[in-house]
UniProtKB/Swiss-Prot annotation:
Catalytic activity, EC: 4.2.2.n1
CDD domains assigned to the protein according to its UniProt record, in alphabetical order: MLTF-like, PBP2_YfhD_N
One BP annotation, GO: cell wall organization
Function text: Murein-degrading enzyme that degrades murein glycan strands and insoluble, high-molecular weight murein sacculi, with the concomitant formation of a 1,6-anhydromuramoyl product. Lytic transglycosylases (LTs) play an integral role in the metabolism of the peptidoglycan (PG) sacculus. Their lytic action creates space within the PG sacculus to allow for its expansion as well as for the insertion of various structures such as secretion systems and flagella.
SMART domains registered for this protein in UniProt: PBPb (SM00062)
Domain notes: The N-terminal domain does not have lytic activity and probably modulates enzymatic activity. The C-terminal domain is the catalytic active domain.
GO molecular function: peptidoglycan lytic transglycosylase activity
Protein name: Membrane-bound lytic murein transglycosylase F
Chain segments carrying region LT domain: 270-514
Main location: membrane
Reaction equation(s) it catalyzes: Exolytic cleavage of the (1->4)-beta-glycosidic linkage between N-acetylmuramic acid (MurNAc) and N-acetylglucosamine (GlcNAc) residues in peptidoglycan, from either the reducing or the non-reducing ends of the peptidoglycan chains, with concomitant formation of a 1,6-anhydrobond in the MurNAc residue
Family membership noted in the UniProt record: In the N-terminal section; belongs to the bacterial solute-binding protein 3 family.
Gene3D superfamilies: 1.10.530.10, Periplasmic binding protein-like II
Amino acid sequence: MKKLKINYLFIGILTLLLAAALWPSIPWFGKTENHIAAIQARGVLRVSTIDSPLTYSVINGKKYGLDYELAQQFANYLGVKLKVTVRQNISQLFDDLDNGNADLLAAGLVYDSARVKNYQPGPMYYSVSQQLVYRVGQYRPRSLATVNENQLTIAPGHVVVNDLQRLKETKFPDLSWKVDDKKGSTTLLEEVISGKLDYTIADSVAIGLFQRVHPELAVALDVTDEQPVTWFSRLDDNNTLSAALLDFFNSINEDGSLARIEEKYLGHGDDFDYVDTRSFLRAVDNVLPELEPLFKKYAKEIDWRLLAAISYQESHWDPLATSPTGVRGLMMLTKNTAQSLGLTDRTDAEQSISGGARYLEDMMAKVPETVPEDERIWFALAAYNMGYAHMLDARSLTVKTKGNPDSWTDVKQRLPLLSQKPYYSKLTYGYARGHEAYAYVENIRKYQISLVGYLQEKEKQEAEAMKLAQDYPAVSPEELNKAPFPLLSFLSQSSGYLTHSPSLLFTPQKKEEK
């Protein structure tokens, strides 16, 4: 799979094209009989979506998601409230448009020539590919030539059906598939994971998220090239809603807020490591329970799961871990840092965790106030790894290379340059292993994603097991808990730091499975 791309250039080109087409409708606030006027008169923007980690999810009563945040900002832009309706599958989403029950569909839907004949697309803001997935250990198809309807099931309304039909007509005459009208893409992915289904097709971002909690889900092959993701609305003769969307996306693109939201949800790295993820989840089961009370005790300004992810990146939760440079313990503190924090034994789990948490808090306090609240933690982690002075150099280099020093997206791209002489020789604090700091932060984000999703699923499994045990007293919760749990939508935000986010940038595992 190609790396997911954020299409800022495409947005700019599309802006010019749509502006010409929509010019009679601008300024759209002055219209009296139009879609925007109807929305404002109603006082509500109606958006239909699908429950997924990337688009929209409710965790502990709070709402998250890339499309949700953008839709909320658009509602604010229009001066109205947002009403979100969650549907089971894509077909139901377009039914909402057809029946006049939704103004917009914001659900990670890809641009498709067949769709745009009947519905109005908005600006495109990132891209995905469609991929065939299977379970590790099962037969991996190398081509679609031998895939049939007894193996491959697709969710209703999935645009990939059009691609499959074209492939059947041009390359693979024996290709066949089944559409299950009662199941969405998430359910079908769960069935592949559980072994109930051989194959399904989903977008690369959704697959990347599933793999963080279920590393046994594997990519067999790409079915399509990269496809732009967009919102959809009804075809509108006066184009006022399209013009409003165009203005809105232009504004958030120019002020940097679109890039920040996409970094939050899509900026978590591009490599999936099956062995590493599986090892981490085993450690969550076998090692974390003993350390969890300490992480919860000392994580004051951040989510305890983030602190746990930092510790795993540092030491793999080994209190006796020691590096060649002399750093030691769960949080891998230097001797000088430990002394400055009043620690006497770096190999003592509680001392190490408390010291690491305080040191991270110190780094966060130093991050310039101009950095957005939800990105401060990433700057602090880079400073935690390579030193605050080198983080300042990275910001300075970002300015010199015409980037935004307050944008983590921009700054992290410059981190590897700190180890290259043409760059570090001109910086105040000189050489730094910036590439290691980059990998350090990205790995922590990945571990936190896995930890949050895995723990939330276990909690739900335990709750369901208790309910089933009450309904069927002959079966104990312990027996029910032995069954594999299904993937649920998972996001988490603690102390203002979002941990998910569907866009991660993922590629399928490199190791081929037989």
